[in-house]
Amino acid sequence: MSIRERLLATVSQYIAAYNEFDPSAMKTVRTPTCLSHGIAPTCKFTQSVEEHTRHMMLSRGVFRSVNASIVDDDTTVVDEVSRHVVVKVKIRCETTVGPYENEAIFIMAMDEEGALVDGIFQFLDTARFQQFQGRLDEAQESKN
């Protein structure tokens, strides 16, 4: 398998694990030192694997199903030398406050073998994310 094929296979495995929305599945495709970064100006964060696991566990109470898919393979960028892959992703979720859809750019840095994700930079459509966050806030306020 060429390095390009290996990198793309790792991206596919990451997306499959993302769709399971299970922290243990996510850990199988990430290095122990992998960091997740939100890079949108209104949605900035950096999480270690452990922090990401805690975040997912808390989010499981909100997300009933998650379906992420690569939007267009023609827009995927693979840099074999630096072991980076850039993909445009469509995310569809069923949540406790109804459907949530968003698009994102994932910039994924892989380990030397190209078999594990060593860092991921996510750029979400923040307008859609803020609308969803508003629905969550309204639902929480109506409970109080």
UniProtKB/Swiss-Prot annotation:
In terms of superkingdom, the source organism counts as Eukaryota
Query: Which pathway is this protein assigned to?
Result: Secondary metabolite biosynthesis; terpenoid biosynthesis
GO BP annotations of the record are: terpenoid biosynthetic process
Q: Which InterPro entries match?
A: Fungal_Meroterpenoid_Isomerase (IPR050977), NTF2-like_dom_sf (IPR032710)
Also noted in the record is: In A.calidoustus, the austinoid gene cluster lies on a contiguous DNA region, while clusters from E.nidulans and P.brasilianum are split in their respective genomes. Genetic rearrangements provoked variability among the clusters and E.nidulans produces the least number of austionoid derivatives with the end products austinol and dehydroaustinol, while P.brasilianum can produce until acetoxydehydroaustin, and A.calidoustus produces the highest number of identified derivatives.
Family membership: Belongs to the trt14 isomerase family.
Tell me, what does this protein do in biology?
Part of the gene cluster B that mediates the biosynthesis of the fungal meroterpenoid acetoxydehydroaustin. The first step of the pathway is the synthesis of 3,5-dimethylorsellinic acid by the polyketide synthase ausA. 3,5-dimethylorsellinic acid is then prenylated by the polyprenyl transferase ausN. Further epoxidation by the FAD-dependent monooxygenase ausM and cyclization by the probable terpene cyclase ausL lead to the formation of protoaustinoid A.
Assembly description? Homodimer.
Q: Cross-referenced PANTHER family, in alphabetical order?
A: AUSTINOID BIOSYNTHESIS CLUSTERS PROTEIN F-RELATED (PTHR39598:SF1), AUSTINOL SYNTHESIS PROTEIN F-RELATED (PTHR39598)
Q: What is this protein called?
A: Austinoid biosynthesis clusters protein S
Source organism (scientific name): Penicillium brasilianum
